[in-house]
Amino acid sequence: MARSFITKDANGNPAIRKPRGGEQMYRGTPRYCSMAAHQRRDQGRVDDLWGWLHTLVELHCGLPWRNERDEARVAKMKGEMAPEKLCERCPAEFLPIHKYLTILKYESRPDYFAIYTHLLEGIRRCKSSFMYPYEWEDSPREVETALSISENSITTKKPATKVHMARRMYPQARSEYFKENALGF
């Protein structure tokens, strides 16, 4: 199901694997996959992000093609769907991510920090927090209790603050982590 996109060049240095020509084996779920998958082209990092974005839209408001079973019709709907229409009932931050993905190519290294920043803007705009409980959590105190016990037993007997617990549970990524490019791609 997966294929390495990094190989070695003639000198033995890491290089991005060139996309294979011709029709490729279909990998994916029609509802979530990228247009490259529908078109049987080789897939890169951007195609993973298309699957991720389609999943977010599905979870938030449902994809327009969610009831369609025919792959060709799903591909046609995706190809004809304006980004504004797809994202109209989604958080405002989804649209710039969608538009950004449309400019990426197979070999492109996505700007993950920009995507992350858009998502954080949405969290801030909604005045939300990583510490808010999910709907399925019985009590907002469950997470705090679990983290406090863990935190106190490992480091100190002082109770952990909400901010400290949030950092432990959901560390805020710093831009240098996203910009770090250990493989050079």
Model regions: which residues?
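Activation segment/activation loop of eukaryotic-type protein kinase catalytic domains
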Residues: 1-31
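C-terminal lobe of the eukaryotic/viral protein kinase catalytic domain
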Residues: 51, 61-106
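Conserved end of the kinase activation segment
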Residues: 35-47
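Conserved C-lobe helical segment of Hanks-type protein kinase catalytic domains
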Residues: 36, 96-103, 118-121
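A short RP[S/T]Φ-enriched loop at the C-terminal end of the protein kinase catalytic domain
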Residues: 46, 106-113, 127-128
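A conserved short alpha-helix in the C-terminal lobe
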Residues: 47-59
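Hydrophobic anchor on a C-lobe helix of Hanks-type protein kinase catalytic domains
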Residues: 37, 59-60
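Extended, low-complexity, intrinsically disordered C-terminal regulatory tails
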Residues: 70, 79-89, 113-117, 124-185
